[in-house]
């Protein structure tokens, strides 16, 4: 489903543009690295072949796409969640080569209709006895109906920060965690969906966090070499 990817590209492009405003990108990072032979990159001081290979290894379980000057890295487990009509949260990573950032997305799917949610709770622990709660509020949630699948999809993506990374860490360190999509009242009816954060989502979160940390420690040249070869 293209809506989720498009939302991420829009968010990533806007944030990277803001970060780079007034700053010219190095020529090496301005275009897909496939145009730059690795032999040329290897001659530069800031390329470590082992680091490049380590990034490539991490990308084995990641869906990689390039659009509008942005590399987007998404967990391959999102395909599982979408195909099985699940609701989930997932981090993602985006980069223009020089800058590396991570984002967050929340997605709900239902066959009966929209929930019309604009806030989501992350509940750590058992549902009826959770130990912590993080609430996310949103001004705009994208909604689209897919008639072939008879799915009402709602999705939001945004740039992540340290608090979001802390939330992900608490999820991964907990035995159980849930998402609660709090629907708005429409025509006197309010629908709320609660779903467990499953093992596939947890693995996807782990893969993205590991990739993000590795890219943060790499040089521009190492990232570009890994992305394009």
Give the ranges of each region predicted by the language model.
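Gram-positive cell-envelope targeting signals
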Residues: 1-43, 171
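A generic "folded-domain core" signal
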Residues: 29-229
């Amino acid at each position: 489903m293209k809506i989720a990817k498009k939302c991420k590209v829009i968010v990533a492009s806007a944030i990277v543009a803001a970060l780079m405003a007034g700053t010219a990108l190095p020529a090496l990072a301005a275009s897909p690295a496939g145009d730059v032979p690795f032999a040329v990159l290897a001659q530069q001081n800031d390329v470590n072949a082992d680091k490049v290979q380590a990034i490539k290894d991490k990308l084995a379980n990641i869906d990689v796409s390039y659009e509008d000057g942005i590399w987007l890295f998404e967990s391959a487990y999102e395909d599982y969640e979408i195909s099985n009509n699940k609701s989930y949260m997932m981090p993602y990573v985006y980069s223009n080569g020089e800058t590396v950032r991570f984002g967050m997305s929340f997605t709900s799917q239902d066959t009966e209709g929209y929930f019309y949610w604009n806030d989501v709770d992350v509940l750590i622990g058992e549902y009826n006895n959770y130990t912590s709660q993080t609430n996310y509020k949103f001004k705009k949630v994208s909604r689209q109906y897919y008639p072939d699948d008879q799915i009402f999809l709602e999705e939001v993506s945004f740039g992540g920060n340290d608090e979001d990374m802390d939330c992900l860490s608490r999820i991964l360190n907990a035995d159980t965690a849930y998402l609660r999509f709090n629907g708005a009242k429409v025509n006197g009816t309010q629908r709320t969906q609660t779903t467990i954060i499953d093992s596939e989502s947890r693995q996807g979160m782990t893969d993205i966090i590991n990739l993000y940390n590795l890219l943060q420690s790499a040089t521009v040249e190492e990232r570009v070499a890994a992305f394009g070869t």
